[in-house]
């Protein structure tokens, strides 16, 4: 079978994927040292670094792009873990702080005596048939826990910000 001329040209024009660059330990040490100082080195710093570690400036530039992406990914994961652990501890505190007395049911006299001006008027009512799901309670606990988490983060942030007198 013979190939048509157009298919032969297309095969020759197809770009070869470049091989993955493998960095040796001294190159990685030098790259990481510069990354500790700045996540965005300028062209002169990249060129000098490339010359010192025997890489092209383009490879150094791509390494920094990838390293910044890794840094952001690790930072997000760390924040997510910290938030999850704080949320877990707050939800455990919320469970401890729950009142021992049962909440009033829809038909209890306490519930019927609440007026629309009551501060509890925005709390969702529980149905008399007992169909109020555990999910509502969980959502309320999560909501309270997330509000406590936000308040704690806010107060921590306020304590870290220097005041100007």
UniProtKB/Swiss-Prot annotation:
Residues 9-20 have a biased composition (Basic residues). Pfam families: Homeodomain (PF00046), OAR (PF03826). Residues 16-75 bind DNA. Residues 1-24 are annotated as: Disordered. GO terms for biological process: regulation of transcription by RNA polymerase II. Cranial mesenchyme, limb buds, axial mesoderm, and branchial arches and their derivatives. Also found in the heart especially in the ventricular septum and ductus arteriosus. The gene is PRRX2. This is Paired mesoderm homeobox protein 2. Belongs to the paired homeobox family. Its main location: nucleus. One of its GO terms (molecular function) is RNA polymerase II cis-regulatory region sequence-specific DNA binding. One of its GO terms (cellular component) is nucleus. May play a role in development of the heart. A motif (OAR) lies at residues 142-155. It is found in: Nucleus. Keywords: Developmental protein, DNA-binding, Homeobox, Nucleus. The keyword Glycosyltransferase does not apply.
């Amino acid at each position: 079978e013979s190939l048509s001329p157009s298919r032969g040209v297309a095969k020759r024009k197809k770009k070869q994927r470049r091989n993955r660059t493998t960095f040796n330990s001294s190159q990685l040490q030098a790259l990481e040292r510069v990354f500790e100082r700045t996540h965005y080195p300028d062209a002169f710093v990249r060129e000098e670094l490339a010359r010192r570690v025997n890489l092209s400036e383009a490879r150094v530039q791509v390494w920094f792009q990838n390293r910044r992406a890794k840094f952001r990914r690790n930072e997000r994961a760390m924040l997510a873990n910290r938030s999850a652990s704080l949320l877990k501890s707050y939800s455990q505190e919320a469970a401890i702080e729950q009142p021992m007395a049962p909440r009033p049911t829809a038909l209890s006299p306490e519930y019927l005596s609440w007026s629309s001006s009551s501060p509890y008027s925005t709390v969702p009512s529980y149905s008399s048939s007992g169909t109020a799901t555990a999910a509502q309670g969980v959502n309320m606990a999560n909501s309270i826990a997330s509000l406590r988490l936000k308040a704690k983060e806010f107060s921590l942030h306020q304590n870290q910000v220097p005041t100007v007198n």
